[in-house]
Regions:
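Noncatalytic, beta-rich nucleic-acid-contacting surfaces in large DNA/RNA-processing enzymes
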Residues: 1-140
Length: 140
């Protein structure tokens, strides 16, 4: 799923349709964008059939394969733009058996992920209400 980009493909049916049409109407679209448009067509059909993509899940996502969830799919870590297979594999290995109390703790444990990757995962909803840091406030 090289052309699968979670930022676009997991944004919902209307967002997928808009991005797909935007690329298709761009006569100067790059080969990468054209490949993404083809993937978006498949994603649009997926949504039309009543399925959905769950957010990338720091505990459940595989490195390179989609995971089946109730009525949908959980994308792999490689679906994050710019996140390569080796970083995805390392992340799955490093997170094994752990429970994280903050984004900071996850980031320190999964050290192959850049700040940009962490920010993208945050924007995609992968941390589901998890606090940014492990610090607690005694007087706040």
């Amino acid at each position: 799923a090289k052309a699968f980009d979670a930022e676009y493909c997991c944004a919902g049916q209307e967002a997928v349709k808009q991005k797909m049409l935007e690329i298709m109407n761009n006569k100067e679209a790059t080969a990468v964008e054209q490949s993404l448009a083809t993937t978006l067509e498949v994603c649009y059909e997926f949504y039309l059939r009543g399925y959905h993509f769950d957010p990338i899940n720091i505990y459940e996502s595989d490195a390179t394969h989609f995971v089946i969830s109730e009525n949908g799919l959980i994308p792999p870590f490689v679906a994050v733009s710019g996140l390569g297979e080796s970083a995805a594999l390392a992340t799955v290995e490093q997170r094994a058996g752990k429970h994280f109390i903050s984004v900071e703790e996850f980031s320190l444990c999964c050290n192959k992920l850049s700040k940009t990757h962490i920010d993208t995962l945050r924007a995609l909803g992968s941390f589901a209400g998890m606090p940014d840091t492990s610090q607690i406030s005694l007087f706040g």
